[in-house]
């Protein structure tokens, strides 16, 4: 279908958008105003780690009812769409070509499945080829349709940073997955974090920020120690003033390993816990 700004189906999220397209072509649906949405973008030539994290974040967000927006490119975009579908959620692909063209062809399955559980969206008419100049343009629509933008992996001059810039101009929150210093695929994300982007440590963290699903700081009736209200307090209480090995902290906290590690990292960043040597922690005095 074709919709214009005068159409009642036109996304309110696009109102006031700088360079608003004169129309949109849609196969399937567009996000409604009540729908919580996250854009997950990143490198086409991503690492195995990037693929895994894009899929993981998208799947968990989708399971919690958050729809995933991306660009159906190879790499991070494709894995984000696939993760959302695997999580039983909705996903939307903003294309840099006409609706009648599947680009890249390797994503044919996504091209066919996404309209059944979301939609394909483009400002380019049928027959429009996937020209290089189209992709930076479509990025402004990706960010505009999202409540929050997550960059998973990006080089220093990645197109994903264009999406992040658009998001900031539009007043959206931007988060990035941290990576190893010196890793080319992490330079863009680490740069965003250095410039003030949020640190994406887990899907649960982003769900809490978006007010969707169970957040990190919600209390858990099963995992309480001395009446502690949150998992964060629980983990902190398991760290002593003397060095303590990780396996002992895990045993006492009785939380999933990845959750405990995530909270320990947060506590380190806050200056409340030190990793005195590998897998050994103590409270900072």
Please place each PLM-identified region on the residue numbering.
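Glycine-biased, small-residue-rich flexible motifs in mid-sequence functional cores and linkers
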Residues: 2-285
């Amino acid at each position: 279908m074709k919709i214009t700004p005068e159409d009642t189906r036109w996304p309110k999220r696009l109102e006031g958008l700088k360079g608003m397209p004169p129309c949109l072509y849609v196969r399937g649906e567009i996000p409604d105003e009540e729908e919580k949405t996250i854009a997950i973008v990143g490198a086409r030539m991503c690492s195995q780690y990037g693929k895994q994290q894009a899929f993981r974040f998208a799947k968990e967000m989708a399971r919690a009812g958050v729809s995933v927006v991306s660009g159906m490119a190879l790499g991070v975009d494709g894995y984000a769409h696939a993760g959302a579908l695997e999580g039983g959620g909705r996903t939307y692909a903003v294309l840099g070509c006409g609706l009648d063209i599947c680009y890249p062809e390797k994503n044919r399955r996504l091209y066919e499945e996404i309209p059944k559980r979301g939609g394909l969206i483009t400002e380019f008419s049928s027959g429009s080829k996937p020209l290089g100049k189209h992709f930076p343009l479509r990025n402004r629509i990706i960010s505009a349709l999202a409540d929050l933008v997550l960059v998973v992996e990006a080089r220093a001059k990645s197109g994903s940073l264009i999406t992040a810039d658009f998001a900031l101009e539009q007043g959206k929150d931007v988060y990035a997955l941290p990576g190893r210093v010196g890793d080319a695929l992490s330079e863009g994300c680490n740069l965003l974090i250095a410039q003030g982007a949020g640190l994406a440590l887990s899907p649960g963290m982003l769900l809490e920020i978006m007010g969707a699903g169970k957040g990190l700081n919600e209390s858990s009736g099963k995992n309480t120690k001395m009446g502690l209200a949150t998992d964060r307090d629980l983990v902190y209480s398991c760290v002593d003033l003397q060095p303590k090995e990780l396996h002992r902290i895990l045993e006492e906290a009785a939380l999933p390993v990845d959750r405990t590690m995530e909270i320990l990292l947060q506590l380190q960043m806050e200056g409340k816990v030190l990793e005195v040597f590998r897998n050994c922690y103590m409270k900072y005095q």
